[in-house]
Amino acid sequence: MLLNKMEVSMRNKKLLAIATILVGLIIILILSDMVGKIDNEENARVHQHIDNRKPIDETDTSLDITAEGFSTHLPVVILNTNGQQIMSKLDTDGDPKINIEVQIIDNEDSLNSIGDTPAVETISSVRYRGNSSLYYDKKQYALEFLNADGTENVTEVMGMAAGSEWVLNGTFLDKSHIRNYIAYNIAGEIMDYAPNIRFCEVFLYDGETYTYQGLYTMVESIERALDRVNVTKYDEDRIESSYIIRRDRFSEDEVMLYNYGTVNGLTEEWLGVKYPSEAKITEETLKYIENDISEFERVIYSDDYETFKTYTNYINVDSFVDYFVINEFFGNYDAGLHSTYAYKDLTGKLTMGPVWDYDGAMDNATPWELEPDATAFKTASWFNALIKDEEFCRKVVARYNELRKSYLSDEYIDEYIDELVDYLGASIDRDYQVWGYIFEQETLVNVENKYGVVNDRNVDTYEEEIERIKLALHKHAEYLDAEFYNDISGTIMYEPENLSSMRYLAIFFIATFFVIVIFVRQE
């Protein structure tokens, strides 16, 4: 009897051990599935066309763009110049900014009209912004809200978190109006942060006459702030600092870096410091940032594997993976070359983003068309080095495959576009009254593709442009679904030497499990 109890006790202990191992395996699998994923539930991204639909009747069909007859379901921005001329960097050797008055009309439950009580009323500096876009007829505006004493006026705008710096983007070459909106919002669901964006309609007022400027987006500019790029504030008494950098054209008006990659011709274009500001950054802090970037670049462009494999000590790998996937999916050929941001917190690693400037994405680049059956982003600075690592390539493709089941699926993208176009409604036609002649211009160069076929990308109607976006995304995604890994893995030089610690633990538990099973059966 005593022996039977002992046998039962031993058997129970063995079963308990097996159960413990099985639970451990389940936990390992769950944790493994979570690794590399970014939880954005707390970000609560607002999509204007979904979340800000007003309970109004269907009277927003008027095409009247006079101040007396105008009404819209979108917010209205009035730029009161009091007769001053808005300028750009091309118009003066000094500071092109002038101070104007800005009103934003954004009624909660009715259409918005000129003369309604403004939700926001502020002084603001303004200038024309952009590079090539400075030459377009429809201008873009950089705004900085100010108090009467000249200090920053940090204000909530159209439901976006309070800030002082804003961009009014007119997207003259984007005949669809929607490329930036789609890319920013979907990136905002995937990455830690992407600029929030709202559609609005804009009027210029010179003190006497209101002039309709068309359909715009109000966008959060990229700056250090709690609800934007949330890095530690710069302390001028310290050499080390958080920073925000941008890859773009060389500019004498910005603080440029002479980092290892640039000086040695390993990367394209130039890196400039966006934060800390030129007015505050010390020479010592500038040198610190330059050295910090150079140290990372020496690692990824090293021919020594022992050095190269330490790159994960310097960067937030997941952010680089997401940045690769988003820009490749949307065919943003300018990313990695221009308007390419990265940031680093004082206590963190170098992080890619936020995303910016998708006017030329989705087969809208002026000098070349999107090649559906090719991967372009693999040649971008820094990324052309990272894809030497098999593990990085596998992370990129795994993340892409994961997102193709949700935010990057054909079904999600098509429905998103259709609902957005429906939401914009008559605002598209009002804008067309002023800027519709863009459809008559050959704005996109019809270059010969690698098959010798010349494809005319200049469409005649808005509806054709929307279909062109969908088709470009579908074709490119179809290629990536089949060939993404094969395409980017062609330059792999380094295969992982060791399995991750998580996989080691899984193997250990599995091996232990089978040993115990064999032991129990022998008993």
Regions inferred by a protein language model and the residue ranges of each:
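Middle-to-C-terminal accessory/interaction subdomains
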Residues: 28-39, 132, 273-337, 345-505, ...
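N-terminal module-boundary/linker segments of secreted carbohydrate-active enzymes
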Residues: 35-111, 116, 495-496
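Short, solvent-exposed loop/turn and secondary-structure capping segments
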Residues: 89-92, 113-115, 154-157, 179-180, ...
